[in-house]
A protein has these predicted regions:
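Glycine/threonine-rich ATP-lid/beta-loop region of ATP-binding domains
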Residues: 1-97, 101-105
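Charged regulatory segments coupled to nucleotide-binding catalytic modules in large multidomain enzymes
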Residues: 73, 84-185
Length: 187
């Protein structure tokens, strides 16, 4: 059940203008709603969908991600990633969703890069990542596994290295920056 629920969440995060509803039939015959939402549309759809699924607190802990990773042809990485501030990440990498042109994608290499770069800024946590890699349809092959979630990307190594560089650039302004609480008067 958990695997199916996670898969539905992955689709609900990336789709636009779709009504999602799923429930679980308990042994006593009672139904419990697990996922009820209408996916948003527009430029902030991923963050809005994230807020609907995981709550506004989770949505407030992320920043937009829009990286131009073009090498020979146009390519972008769009979505959201946790702000590299202590306390805004997660204790595990359970909220990392990757897509290739809107198709859910099991990409452990991209997850590893996101985790590695993020942990240079926040060493104790993992980022929430919802990232859609947008490349030309002739730059990847979906016929790798029956579930179509394992994809072969042409020039994958160069694209991933470019993503690493741009993620480091994105986070670098926050290097060495710490959140400070309001000063309190000692009595």
């Amino acid at each position: 059940y958990n695997k199916a629920h996670t898969m539905l969440q992955a689709y609900a995060l990336i789709t636009q203008n779709v009504r999602w509803s799923s429930c679980v039939q308990l042994e006593n015959g009672r139904q419990v709603s697990q996922l009820v939402m209408r996916s948003a549309s527009g430029p902030n759809a991923i963050q809005t969908n994230m807020s609907a699924l995981f709550g506004t607190k989770a949505s407030a802990a992320v920043q937009p991600l829009d990286l131009d990773i073009s090498l020979d042809e146009p390519a972008r990485l769009q979505g959201v990633i946790s702000k590299p501030t202590m306390g805004l990440g997660r204790s595990s990498g359970d909220r990392q969703y990757f897509y290739l042109n809107g198709r859910p994608w099991d990409c452990t290499k991209l997850a590893h890069i996101c985790n590695q770069v993020y942990r240079t800024f926040n060493a104790t946590q993992y980022p929430t990542v919802i990232a859609n890699l947008i490349i030309g349809p002739d730059k990847y092959d979906v016929n790798v596994s029956p579930d179509k979630r394992t994809l072969y990307v042409h020039d994958e190594t160069a694209l991933l290295e470019r993503i690493r560089e741009l993620l480091e650039d994105t986070f670098s302004p926050s290097r060495g920056v710490f959140a400070v609480d309001e000063p309190k008067k000692l009595s």
